[in-house]
Structures are given as structure tokens and as C-alpha cells.
């Protein structure tokens, strides 16, 4: 579970900060949950938790569930939020986010 990688309190705080529809901001979220300050190895482990089908990529369907990937209490992202997150993370334009793209996305300020 994600709580093996990040503090439960930080996850809870980060997810509740974006409880309102259309409020998701990935930069603030990764900062609040503590992931941004973690090592590349931890970021890669988080990626593999979020990559539910273990395809090596986080596809749009999985991105929509990113908050639920951190905690079951998380909400699904709206289509607009998901599209914006995909656009921010998909550097090579293949329509999905690979592990290196994810690490870059989390690390960007």
C-alpha cells in the first residue's frame, strides 16, 4: 500500500485538499503528500502502485483514479482534470505516462 511509501497523515491531507471537483493541482498534490521530496526510487515505487494493470505506463483510465491510488477515500478526477494531468506528464506525446515521465512530473516545481 501507499502508506508503506508515504506518511498516512500526509496522504490524507493531500487528498482532502483536493476534495472539491475541478480543484486538482498535481504540483501541490505531490508536494502535500510528501512525494516530491522523496528519492527517485520511492517515486518509481509509487508509479508501480498507480500502474494498476502493470503495463509499465499510467494510462488515462488509471490517471483518473490517481487519488484513489493513494487512498480509497480519494475521489475520481474529472475528465478535464485527467486530461490536464496527462498533458502535463506525457512528454513524448504517446497518450500515457511512463515511469521516467512520472518521476519528471513529480519533480517539476
From Swiss-Prot:
The record, for PROSITE patterns, names: EF_HAND_1, EF_HAND_2
Pfam families listed in its UniProt record = EF-hand_7
Q: Which SMART domains match?
A: EFh
InterPro entries hit by this protein: EF-hand-dom_pair, EF_Hand_1_Ca_BS, EF_hand_dom, Parvalbumin
Alphabetized, the UniProt keywords read:
Calcium, Metal-binding, Muscle protein, Repeat
Question: In the UniProt entry for this protein, what further remark is given in the free-text comments?
Answer: This parvalbumin has an isoelectric point of 4.88.
Q: Which family does it belong to?
A: Belongs to the parvalbumin family.
PANTHER family with a match to the protein in the record: PARVALBUMIN ALPHA
Q: What is this protein called?
A: Parvalbumin alpha
